Amino acid sequence: MGNERLKAPEGPPSDVERIKEESNYLRGTLKESMLEPISAGISDDDNRLMKHHGSYLQDDRDLRNERQKQKLEPAYQFMLRVRMPGGVATPEQWLVMDELAQKYGNGTMKLTTRETFQLHGILKWNMKKTIQAIHSALLDTIAACGDVNRNVMCTSNPYQSEIHQEVYEWSKKLSDDLLPRTRAYHEIWLDEEKVAGTPEAEEVEPMYGPLYLPRKFKIGIAVPPSNDIDVFSQDLGFIAIVEDDKLVGFNVAIGGGMGMTHGDKATYPQLAKVIGFCKPEQIYDVAEKIITIQRDYGNRSVRKNARFKYTVDRLGLETVKNELENRLGWSLDEAKPYHFDHNGDRYGWVKGVKGRWHFTLFVEGGRVTDYADYKLMTGLREIAKIHTGDIRLTSNQNLIIANVTSQKKKKINELIEQYGLTDGKHYTALRRSSIACVALPTCGLAMAEAERYLPKLIDKIDEIIEENGLKNEEITIRMTGCPNGCARHALGEIGFIGKAPGKYNMYLGAAFDGSRLSKMYRENIGEEEILKELREILPRYAKERKEGEHFGDFVIRAGIIKETTDGTNFHD
C-alpha cells in the first residue's frame, strides 16, 4: 500500500529545472558571463546556476530608484557565502575573510544563521580573486546555496568540548560526502583544466543526478540540551545521543523547513519529526538515501512546494520512513530519549575540558563591522592575530573564541576589554536572544527591513521589558524581511515577517526550546501597533506567569494565541 503513494507530483518542470538540465552540470555560460565587460551583472539563467557556486547576484536597493532615473543599470554586486560545516574557522581563516571583506566586499562580514560567513558588495570583476583567496585559506563556497545540500550545522557547545569536537567531525565529513561531484566550480573559479570526453550522468553526479534536487536541502546536528541549531527546522536533523559521556548515535528527524509564501496556505513552516535512531557511522547512508528520496519524489514543477517537508507531508511520514529503510537495506532503531531546554546561546567565559576556555561574544544581527563607538571588527582582528584555538560561528549569529589556553586567556581578555567586545550582559536578555536576516538593502527578496531595523525596535521594546522587570528573562525574538525564513522567524517566541516597507506580520507562541511553531497574531502592522500589542501582553506575562514559564508557553496558556500543533495548521 505504502509504495503506491511513491510518485512525484505531476506537472511540467519549472524553468529552473530546464536551466539545470541545460547547464552541463552547473557550468552554463558562467565562465563567459563573468568575463563579459559591459554589464556588472550576469544573465538570469547563469544567476540561477551561480547559487550552486555559493553566490547570489544582488543590487543595492537603496540606490535602485536613483540609478533608474539616471538610466543606469542597477548597482549590481555579489553576495558570497562560505561553506564551513559546523561553523569552525581557524584564526588564520578569520583574518583572510576580514581582509577580503575590506579589499573586495563592503567592509563588513555577516555571520549567518547557518554558522558561516557571508561577504556582500563584491563586484563581478573581483569574484574570481575572492573565491581563489578563500580556496587558499582551505575554505570554499561550493554548494553554499542552490538545489543541493547546504552548509551542515552542528551545536556550538562550549560545555562539552569533546562531544562537540566529535559531532563537528561528523558534520564535516557529512558535508564533504554530500558535495556535488561536478568539477564546474574548480574549472570556472580555480582554473582547473576540463577533462576531455563526456562521462555518463551517474559518473558525474552519482547521488544528485543531472538535475540535482528540486530545492535546497538543509542538515543540522544538535547536541542536547542545546537546540541552538533549531534541529527541527532542518530538512534532515540529527540529535546526538550521549550515554556515559560517549556519543552512541543520533536520533533522525525529517521534514522541517521555515519558508512559506505570503497569502498561499499551501505553503507553511514545518517541524521535522523523529523517525528513529542510527549509529554515528550510519549517518552518511541515512543522509544519502533521504536525499535520493527527495531527488526522486520532490516537486519539480512548483518550486514553492518543492522542499522536502512538502514531500514528507504529501507522501506521509511512514511511507517515507519505509522507503528510507528499503533503500538502506536495514531498519532504524527506536528513537532514544533526549531533552532540549533552549535554542539560544550561552554567553561569556566558560571552562571546558582539558583546561581550555571559551568566550561567547554577542554580535547583534551577526554584523561584524567597526562602528563609530564600537570597534568590533578591529577587536576581533587583533584577537585572531594572537589566538591559537579556533573561532566558532553560532547559529544565532554570534561567535565563540574557543579553545583558549589559560596562558592566552589573560591577553585575549585584555583585548576584549580594550575594544569593548561584549557578552551582552549589559543588554536585556531579549536583545541577546534576537536574530535577523540581512534583508534590505542587498537581498532581492526582502519586502521590509530586518537587520537594520530590529535593533531600533528592540530599543523601544526594551523600555517595556525594563518597566516590567523582565530584563533578565530570555525571550527569543526574530525578524525576517520576507517569508523565506532565513532567521527562523516561526521558531521565535516573538516573530516578525516583512510584508511591505515598515509593515510586518507578528507571530507569537513558539517554544523556547524550538519544539513548537508560532502562529500569526497580527497581520500587516507597523511599529506603533507592534508596541501597543506588546505593552498589553508583556505586563500580563510579568504578572501572571507561572514559575519558570517561558513567554511562548504563557501566551498559549493565557489564551492570547492558539497553539500550532503542526505546520499543516500554522495558518488556522
From Swiss-Prot:
Signal sequence residues: none
PROSITE patterns from the UniProt entry: NIR_SIR (PS00365)
Cofactor: siroheme; [4Fe-4S] cluster
GO biological process: cysteine biosynthetic process; hydrogen sulfide biosynthetic process; sulfate assimilation
Cross-referenced Pfam families: NIR_SIR, NIR_SIR_ferr
Cystine pairings recorded for this chain: none
GO molecular function: 4 iron, 4 sulfur cluster binding; heme binding; metal ion binding; NADP binding; sulfite reductase (ferredoxin) activity; sulfite reductase (NADPH) activity
Organism: Halalkalibacterium halodurans (strain ATCC BAA-125 / DSM 18197 / FERM 7344 / JCM 9153 / C-125) (Bacillus halodurans)
SUPFAM superfamilies: Nitrite and sulphite reductase 4Fe-4S domain-like (SSF56014), Nitrite/Sulfite reductase N-terminal domain-like (SSF55124)
Co-factor note (free text): Binds 1 siroheme per subunit. Binds 1 [4Fe-4S] cluster per subunit.
Subunit structure: Alpha(8)-beta(8). The alpha component is a flavoprotein, the beta component is a hemoprotein.
Gene that encodes it: cysI
Record pathway: Sulfur metabolism; hydrogen sulfide biosynthesis; hydrogen sulfide from sulfite (NADPH route): step 1/1
Protein name from the UniProt record: Sulfite reductase [NADPH] hemoprotein beta-component
Residue positions binding siroheme: 486
